[in-house]
Amino acid sequence: MRLPYRNKKVTLWVLFGIIVITMFLFKFTELRPTCLFKVDAANELSSQMVRVEKYLTDDNQRVYSYNREMPLIFIGGVPRSGTTLMRAMLDAHPDVRCGQETRVIPRILQLRSHWLKSEKESLRLQEAGITKEVMNSAIAQFCLEIIAKHGEPAPRLCNKDPLTLKMGSYVIELFPNAKFLFMVRDGRATVHSIISRKVTITGFDLSSYRQCMQKWNHAIEVMHEQCRDIGKDRCMMVYYEQLVLHPEEWMRKILKFLDVPWNDAVLHHEEFINKPNGVPLSKVERSSDQVIKPVNLEAMSKWVGQIPGDVVRDMADIAPMLSVLGYDPYANPPDYGKPDAWVQDNTSKLKANRMLWESKAKQVLQMSSSEDDNTNTIINNSNNKDNNNNQYTINKIIPEQHSRQRQHVQQQHLQQQQQQHLQQQQHQRQQQQQQREEESESEREAEPDREQQLLHQKPKDVITIKQLPLAGSNNNNINNNINNNNNNNNIMEDPMADT
């Protein structure tokens, strides 16, 4: 049966309405699922409080996300083992940002370790509902915020807190895709650097080479075990000596291990010191004056001849980890290998221009200090000048820069002389003040005797003054005697007035 035209029209409108309503309901439920479906309030609240994905934006408005699953880079090892050089070379890469050492993360990890070792603290946490998962999540978020926020955003984030590796297995538990670079250096060179530069490390007695070697042996043993437990796919041992002797070969291995593309900038980190998105330095890091230089051999064998004879004799027993790591405990110095030609050339040029590099180190540290004092304007101006000029090289030294360097050194020398003069004056004042105090103290001790003398003298003076009128003397003689008596009293009181 055929429907009339009017009925067909109504039917089409009804079908159209059904389609529109269906599409509206579908879209509405997609945007507002909680309106049609019951959602657990606790889960909803937790999802709002804990954001899995976080974002950072750089100066070019590029957005970077960071979370616990990201491939973080951790540089570990005993302090003074080349960790600062390693992070400076990585910082020169445009895709990597390490930044300065904070020491925050290892302290947080040590605090957590203390809680777990203490039965009292562990019980208190359990009773408070702080489970292992809650603790791990909180520590991971805290560490992630420190790593992500203490420098500029970058595709790959890195942290250089050497002692973090002592808890490397737990760090991998927090960040399963993270990787470690384990910096290894001859323990004799490390200990000599710690002692000569007076680097304070908990447990190290800087007055004893023997004790410091024992502490180094224990620390490196713990880190070596941690790296072995983490596995070769997550922890790579990097020998400082080989990195210095063959920088390009080892940096290619390191970047391949980290899944970071090759960039020649990592071989010239000194050109990016304190530049925007470059290699920031800190005035409190002990290696800042060294990493401003290109890769060189200066620090390779400074320890030779500096260690006491009895410690050298017992070295194999004091530090057995030397042999485990492949170092000869009886060789002074060991044969580390032959350096690349350009590294040897860098070393020769540094020796020829030692005063210039020392002056440059002072300038860089002063710039870092001014950053801490919020004088960023001065730093930006100096960076602009560096960018406008040709890049500094060792082979070519711009005369203007050389004269400025010389003037700066002269000014510093004059300031040091003035400071020494002021210190000498202050020392003299202190000696004079001390001498006055000693004199005043002796005067105080002698005061009772003097008071008794005055008491005995005063009656005689009174008798003399009374007897003068009886003898018919004039008033002038009386006044003179009175004035003489007053002068005697003043002489007795002057020393006490100085006090």
UniProtKB/Swiss-Prot annotation:
Name the residues that bind 3'-phosphoadenylyl sulfate. Answer: 80-84, 185, 193, 197, 240, 287-296, 302
What Pfam families does its record include? Sulfotransfer_3 (PF13469)
Which GO terms of the cellular component aspect does the record hold?
Answer: Golgi apparatus; Golgi membrane
Give the residue spans that cross the bilayer: 10-30
Q: Which reaction does it catalyse?
A: L-tyrosyl-[protein] + 3'-phosphoadenylyl sulfate = O-sulfo-L-tyrosine-[protein] + adenosine 3',5'-bisphosphate + H(+)
Similarity annotation:
Belongs to the protein sulfotransferase family.
Protein name as it appears in the record: Protein-tyrosine sulfotransferase
Question: Which species expresses this protein natively?
Answer: Drosophila melanogaster (Fruit fly)
